[in-house]
Curated annotation (Swiss-Prot):
It is a multi-pass membrane protein. The chain crosses the membrane at residues 13-33, 40-60, 76-96, 112-132, 141-161, 194-214, 237-257, 260-280, 328-348, 354-374, 414-434, 443-463. GO terms for cellular component: plasma membrane. The lineage of its organism: Bacteria, Pseudomonadati, Pseudomonadota, Gammaproteobacteria, Pasteurellales. This is Uncharacterized Na(+)/H(+) antiporter HI_1107. It comes from Haemophilus influenzae (strain ATCC 51907 / DSM 11121 / KW20 / Rd). Signal peptide: none annotated. Pfam families: Na_H_antiporter (PF03553). The keyword Zinc does not apply. It is found in: Cell membrane. Belongs to the NhaC Na(+)/H(+) (TC 2.A.35) antiporter family. GO terms for molecular function: sodium:proton antiporter activity.
Length: 468
């Protein structure tokens, strides 16, 4: 039965102790010893559970708190599953390959850096994966840069910036969905609000890349064979025509008109399935398998496919989201128990004693995000926990929670790839062949978002108020 006897609020030390334990476990276990984050989050939840018992609650209270927290974010979790389905069908239907194909054909030496920014951004928006776009199209651009004797650090920075621009704004991205869910904001409303900081950062990045590219002394070298091979293979595998863009148009229409996300994505996936069967001539079995388990180039029987193209196309499917869902369940369980204990209320009250303006609240959010990503090295947790902790603080200050979701992404999602010790930083450095600290100055979008967030916090521009 549920608690019927007296409970109490935690002291300040008790309130902060679960957060401290979580940071220590993730900082030591995940960052230093490469242990999986999920069991570390579960241990943190168990510790928070002991605190809850000490405060007078019972086991059923804990279960109810966890269930309630997960139930509130279930729509976003269902969107993540639908995103996996969408990516798999878009690849089998030829939508994503068509975008990549025409992007690769548009490469010009003087505009190499800005083209890398735009194309990786487009691919990342369409796929919702920064790692995927950097590991495929990004690698192709690094090959082009080597062939043209271009600045490799600048090229890598442009690739990373483009990849995370798309990841940040894509309705298919896990972090975008998690940020909106953590703050309790509609997905498309969150994406629209992100433009205040992300678009100026993108324009600044593009301007720097254009000016630098036009003033860089390029040798008159042809496009590297690696890129030509990828273009040729895409021509052999897919039949390209404007019908392949209908799934993208549907998602854009849904975003502009603010239609329910899941039905829009399912409609887009359905059209992509029709394209895959009627235009690309894949079997119904292969297309359904792409939707569930992800596309695999072994489904292509009429021509051979290189390992580079396989890396580009082998992705998607509902099952690809299971790892993300697992970490979400673990983090939400921790947040649910933390909320039951009253620790979040105590923490917020303590924070509000130092927060006297919109600017100080924005800076507090940024510091929380930077601390979480720097210590835990996990972008999803770094968005979820600050979102849960600070949501009520924004409401109490009369600020819309979408300011929180935007700032959480500015200080966590796009910061991760420019920190050498994070998984994203290590992946980008290893994949692109350029050290993290070398491409950091050129990944302008990744660090300038925080600057714009602080400017908006100080000026009040782009800060949404709660409607009374």
């Amino acid at each position: 039965m549920k608690t019927t006897h007296r409970t109490r609020m935690p002291t300040t030390l008790e309130a902060f102790s679960p957060i401290i334990v979580m940071l220590l476990l993730l900082g030591l276990g995940y960052a230093l010893f490469d242990l999986p984050a999920e069991p570390l989050m579960i241990i943190s939840t168990v510790f928070a559970g002991f605190l809850v018992f000490k405060l007078g609650h019972c086991y059923l209270d804990i279960l109810d708190a966890i269930s309630e927290k997960i139930a509130k974010t279930m729509p976003a979790l269902l969107i993540l599953i639908t995103v996996g389905l969408l990516i798999g069908t878009w690849i089998s239907g030829g939508t994503i390959p068509m975008m990549i194909y025409y992007g690769l054909k548009a490469i010009s030496p003087e505009y190499l850096y800005v083209t890398a920014l735009f194309l990786t951004a487009i691919v990342s928006i369409c796929t919702g994966t920064s790692w995927g776009s950097a590991g495929t199209v990004g690698v192709a651009f690094m090959g082009v840069a080597i062939g043209l004797d271009a600045n490799l650090a600048a090229t890598a920075g442009a690739v990373v910036a483009g990849a995370y621009f798309g990841d940040k704004l894509s309705p298919l991205s896990d972090t975008t969905n998690i940020a909106s869910a953590a703050a309790g904001v509609d997905l498309y409303e969150h994406i629209a609000h992100l433009l205040y900081t992300t678009l100026p950062s993108f324009i600044l990045s593009a301007t720097v890349y254009v000016v630098y590219g036009l003033n860089y002394d390029f040798s008159n070298v042809a496009t590297p064979e690696k890129v030509n091979t990828m273009i040729h293979e895409l021509e052999q595998v897919y039949h390209f025509n404007f019908l392949l863009l209908i799934p993208v148009a549907i998602v854009l229409w849904g975003s502009i008109t603010k239609k329910p996300t899941i039905p829009v994505m399912l409609l887009s996936a359905f059209i992509a399935i029709i394209n895959a069967i009627l235009i690309q001539k894949f079997s119904l079995s292969d297309v359904i398998n792409s939707a569930v388990n992800g596309f695999d180039t072994s489904m292509i029987h009429h021509t051979s496919v290189s390992s580079d193209l396989s890396r580009l196309l082998n992705r998607g499917g509902m099952n690809s989201m299971m790892g993300t869902l697992l970490i979400c369940f673990c983090a939400l369980s921790f947040a649910g128990v933390l909320q039951l204990s009253g620790a979040l209320t105590v923490i917020i009250q303590k924070l509000l004693t130092f927060v006297h303006s919109t600017l100080s609240l924005i800076i507090t959010t940024i510091l929380c995000g930077l601390t979480m990503i720097g210590v835990t090295c996990n972008g999803q947790i770094s968005i979820l926990i600050p979102g849960e902790m600070l949501k009520n603080a924004y409401v109490e200050k009369g600020l819309h929670p979408k300011n929180l979701s935007r700032t959480a992404e500015d200080s966590a999602t796009i910061i991760e790839p420019i920190l050498p010790w994070t998984a994203a930083g290590a992946y980008m450095a290893g994949t692109l062949g350029v050290a993290t600290l070398s491409y950091l100055p050129w990944a302008i979008l990744c660090w300038s978002g925080i600057i714009f967030a602080i400017i908006y916090g100080a000026s009040g521009i782009g800060i949404a108020k709660l409607k009374k």
